[in-house]
A protein has these predicted regions:
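Conserved hydrophobic/aromatic "anchor" residues
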Residues: 41, 65-66, 108, 116
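Short pre-active-site segment immediately N-terminal to redox-active cysteine/selenocysteine motifs
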Residues: 59-61, 65-69, 101, 138
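A short beta-strand-turn-helix
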Residues: 40-61
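Thiol/disulfide oxidoreductase modules built on the thioredoxin-like
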Residues: 110-114, 122-169
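N-terminal targeting signals for export/organelle localization
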Residues: 1-44, 179-180
Length: 180
C-alpha cells in the first residue's frame, strides 16, 4: 500500500475515534473557566472587525463552534437559524464561531441565510475550544451562557433544535424571573 493511502486511512481512523470519543467524554459546564475569562475572548467577524463574546452578555448566549467542512455542523445550523428567529425576541442570541477562513464562511452564511452573527478564526478558535473543555477538538461544540455570563450547558456533537430548545427555555424563564 502506498504512503498516501496509508495516511488517508490513518486520518479517517483518527477522525472516527474523535467522533466516537466525544460521545463518551462529555464536558461539564463546571469544568470551563470563569465567566469573565470565557467571555473576554475575541474573534474576527466576517468583515474583519474584532468582536468579544462579552458583547452579548445579558442575553442567553449560544456560542456554536463549527466548520464549513463538518457535516454534523452543517446539519444543525438550520435548527439554530430557526431558534434564533423564534427565541431571539425573548432574549436568546446565537453566535457562530467557524474554524475556517472568513471568505469561506462568508459565502456559506450568505448562501444559507444565517440570521445570527458569525465569527471566524483558525488556531485561535481551536485554542479557545480546548480552554473551554473540548480537549479533542470535536466539532460541532456548543457553549450556552446564562444572562449573567455563566456557562450553563456544554454540548459536544450535533445538537438538534428540540434538544437546544429544552436547554434554552428554562434559562429564559430564569432570566425573566430575575428581571421581575
Amino acid at each position: 500500500m502506498n504512503r498516501g493511502w496509508l495516511f488517508i486511512l490513518v486520518a479517517i481512523a483518527g477522525l472516527g475515534a474523535g467522533v466516537l470519543s466525544h460521545r463518551y467524554a462529555p464536558v461539564s459546564a463546571e469544568a470551563v473557566p470563569s465567566t469573565d475569562d470565557a467571555l473576554a475572548v475575541k474573534f474576527d467577524d466576517l468583515e474583519g472587525k474584532s468582536r468579544a463574546l462579552s458583547e452579548w452578555r445579558g442575553k442567553v448566549l449560544v456560542v456554536n463552534f463549527w466548520a464549513t467542512w463538518c457535516p454534523p455542523c452543517l446539519k444543525e445550523i438550520p435548527a439554530f437559524v430557526d431558534l434564533q428567529r423564534r427565541l431571539g425576541p425573548e432574549g436568546v442570541q446565537f453566535v457562530g464561531v467557524a474554524l475556517d477562513g472568513r471568505e469561506e464562511v462568508a459565502a456559506f452564511v450568505r448562501d444559507h441565510a444565517v440570521n445570527y452573527p458569525v465569527l471566524a478564526g483558525e488556531e485561535d478558535v481551536a485554542r479557545y475550544m480546548q480552554q473551554m473543555g473540548n480537549t479533542i477538538g470535536a466539532l460541532p461544540f456548543t457553549l450556552v451562557f446564562d444572562t449573567q455570563g455563566k456557562v450553563r450547558h456544554v454540548h459536544q456533537g450535533e445538537w438538534t433544535g428540540p434538544e437546544a430548545e429544552a436547554v434554552l427555555k428554562p434559562l429564559l424563564s430564569r432570566a425573566s424571573s430575575h428581571a421581575n
